[in-house]
């Protein structure tokens, strides 16, 4: 039976978590449990592998990190719930589950759509622009990297954050794209990452066909230190 481990990492620097994802993916084997990492990042712009420098409109003192996920430039900051999914797609296929990379993208989008629905909000994906939108405004960005049939990176869901830095970029490469966040639609006391993240996780693992007995998230597990094995 596959196990899915959920780790709550709090607020962590982007580059440190990114390199830990790479190490985890490169060193896992066919018996390694899949994992979800929940994290918030201090202010940072990340440029995807297809990113074009002209989408950074106004250089600021916010660092820009060239990363290996798919997609263009986006912004991360505290109050944005990031959910990284480290899933062995190859193993799921070997077990008879017809899960493609496109299916994983859809699962990420739908877990956000379903989370929004929990709050009575109608969100939707766009076939030509990955992510989740509300009335044309983007509330969630996503980007993945697949290495040897295993995923890393994931989604970034705007919950209760300062959206101002998005004005310095063409978010995800789209000029004039307006961003939004959960706080704009519900009481601020409810728009908190620690309240939203369990909903995201539950919808995601249900969509992928995990069951409650497979999930180690009744208590969130901290990531181990860099000096020990993840």
Curated annotation (Swiss-Prot):
GO terms for cellular component: cytoplasm. Residues 30-212 form the BPL/LPL catalytic domain. GO terms for molecular function: lipoyl(octanoyl) transferase activity. Its EC number is 2.3.1.181. The active site is at 172 (acyl-thioester intermediate). The keyword Cytoplasm applies. It catalyses: octanoyl-[ACP] + L-lysyl-[protein] = N(6)-octanoyl-L-lysyl-[protein] + holo-[ACP] + H(+). Substrate binds at residues 69-76, 141-143, 154-156. It is found in: Cytoplasm. It comes from the Bacteria. It holds the Pfam family LplA-B_cat. The record marks 138 as: Lowers pKa of active site Cys. Pathway: Protein modification; protein lipoylation via endogenous pathway; protein N(6)-(lipoyl)lysine from octanoyl-[acyl-carrier-protein]: step 1/2. Disulfide bonds: none annotated. Gene3D superfamilies: Bira Bifunctional Protein, Domain 2. Catalyzes the transfer of endogenously produced octanoic acid from octanoyl-acyl-carrier-protein onto the lipoyl domains of lipoate-dependent enzymes. Lipoyl-ACP can also act as a substrate although octanoyl-ACP is likely to be the physiological substrate. Belongs to the LipB family. This is Octanoyltransferase. It comes from Actinobacillus pleuropneumoniae serotype 3 (strain JL03). The gene is lipB.
């Amino acid at each position: 039976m596959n196990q899915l481990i959920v780790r709550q990492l709090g607020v962590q620097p982007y580059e440190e978590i990114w390199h830990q994802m790479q190490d985890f993916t490169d060193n896992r084997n066919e018996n390694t449990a899949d994992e979800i990492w929940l994290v918030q990042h201090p202010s940072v712009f990340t440029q995807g592998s297809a990113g074009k420098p002209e989408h950074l409109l106004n250089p600021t003192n916010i660092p820009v990190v060239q990363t290996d996920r798919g997609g263009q430039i986006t912004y991360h900051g505290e109050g944005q719930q990031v959910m990284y999914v480290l899933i062995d797609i190859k193993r799921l296929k070997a077990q008879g589950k017809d899960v493609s990379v496109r299916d994983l993208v859809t699962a990420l989008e739908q877990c956000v759509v379903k989370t929004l629905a929990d709050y009575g909000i109608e969100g939707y994906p766009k076939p030509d622009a990955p992510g989740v939108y509300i009335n044309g405004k983007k509330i969630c960005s996503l980007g993945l990297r697949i290495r040897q049939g295993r995923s890393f990176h994931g989604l970034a869901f705007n919950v209760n954050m300062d959206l101002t830095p998005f004005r310095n970029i063409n978010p995800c490469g789209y000029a004039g794209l307006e961003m939004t966040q959960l706080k704009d639609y519900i009481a601020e006391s409810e728009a908190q990452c620690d309240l939203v993240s369990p909903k995201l996780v539950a919808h995601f693992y249900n969509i992928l066909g995990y069951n409650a007995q497979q999930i180690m998230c009744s208590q969130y597990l901290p990531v181990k230190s860099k000096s020990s094995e993840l």
